[in-house]
Amino acid sequence: MKKKIRVLVVDDSAFMRRCLKDILENEEDMEVIDTARDGNEAVKKAVELRPDVITLDINMPVMDGLTALQYIMSLAPCPVVIISSLSTEGALTTFEALELGAVDFVAKPGGTVSLGIKQLADEIVSKVRIAALSNKELLSSSRNFKKLLKRRNQEVTRKVYENKISKKEIVVVIGVSTGGPKTLMEILPYLPSDFPAAVLVVQHMPPGFTQSFAQRLDQSCNLKVKEAEDKAFIEPGTVIIAKGGWHLVVERDSRSSKLITRLTQKPEETLYKPSINVTMKSVLENVDGRNIIGILLTGMGDDGADMMVEIRKRGGLTIAESQETAIVYGMPRAAVERGGAEIVAPAYKISDILLKKVNEYARTSEY
């Protein structure tokens, strides 16, 4: 018999604890081994019971979720799925939790909670399953990993390009899902302000969170980071975050022929919105393949893998995050297995690779 996923449910609301317990125990491969009503209880039970996954509320008495998360990651590292409020303040707190080691989050519904939480049952179950597959060794080593990154990148952030102005349109497309916010924080802040390429980031994320995510990244990066807008020009030295609930595509402006972003609901049938494949395909249709860099980071499934193959066929550079640092080695693995990854590297080396390659692209003669 297959081993069940052992879940610890943490929420200060008895009603929410009961709802989450019912949702999870309705699945044959899951069992709720215990519940906790505050962060203090959560830490004690995490150490004592060693669950496979914890669902964690943020706003709780005695000890809040963020404090509890730090103790859990230090004393009993475990994949954590945050159950968070869909408010501006809630979104910012959620990203702080993701940077501290939580692997994913589910937005608590507004209005009637009893109806809303049941509508989210499929999402909750799916994210708990994916969390159970995450690389637990990375959770326990996250603090040392961050220290290594800070040390290694002190000089990198001060690099200045000899060729600041390039006539080439160099576009970097990054696709990422579960574990993405933490991984992106290990790459984007180490790119200099004169980075001569535009960066498009497609992070699987629900509506209402990507604006706060872009703002948080903007505070940490040398590059300008913003949420995608319809009909906005794509400029070098800018990071554009795909808007939750919309596909991000690239087109040519009819007057200037410059690259612009478009937000669209089509195609409707994709599993994710935004979709990595959709964005990469549109970039391939509008930019010389030799000036494209495709990157696939941590995440479940295979979104982006097919287009990584196409980018490589057209002469672009493709990079897949290695299993060494991927929280969930799904999407990068798919790219590697399909022959879509020219380079396979841990997250902490990707900024260096980008700096080197984009500088080479910018300095070579025009095609």
Swiss-Prot record:
Protein family according to the UniProt entry: Belongs to the CheB family.
A Pfam family of this chain: CheB_methylest
Domain CheB-type methylesterase: 165-361
Organism expressing this protein natively: Caldanaerobacter subterraneus subsp. tengcongensis (strain DSM 15242 / JCM 11007 / NBRC 100824 / MB4) (Thermoanaerobacter tengcongensis)
UniProt enzyme class: hydrolase
PTMs per UniProt: Phosphorylated by CheA. Phosphorylation of the N-terminal regulatory domain activates the methylesterase activity.
Biological process (GO), any one: chemotaxis
Name listed for the protein in its UniProt record: Protein-glutamate methylesterase/protein-glutamine glutaminase
Task performed by this protein: Involved in chemotaxis. Part of a chemotaxis signal transduction system that modulates chemotaxis in response to various stimuli. Catalyzes the demethylation of specific methylglutamate residues introduced into the chemoreceptors (methyl-accepting chemotaxis proteins or MCP) by CheR. Also mediates the irreversible deamidation of specific glutamine residues to glutamic acid.
UniProt GO cellular component terms: cytoplasm
Record InterPro entries: CheB-like (IPR008248), CheB_C (IPR035909), CheY-like_superfamily (IPR011006), Sig_transdc_resp-reg_Me-estase (IPR000673), Sig_transdc_resp-reg_receiver (IPR001789)
Main location (coarse class): cytoplasm
GO MF annotation terms: phosphorelay response regulator activity; protein-glutamate methylesterase activity; protein-glutamine glutaminase activity
PANTHER family according to UniProt: PROTEIN-GLUTAMATE METHYLESTERASE/PROTEIN-GLUTAMINE GLUTAMINASE, PROTEIN-GLUTAMATE METHYLESTERASE_PROTEIN-GLUTAMINE GLUTAMINASE
Active site, UniProt feature: S177, H204, D303
Subcellular location: Cytoplasm
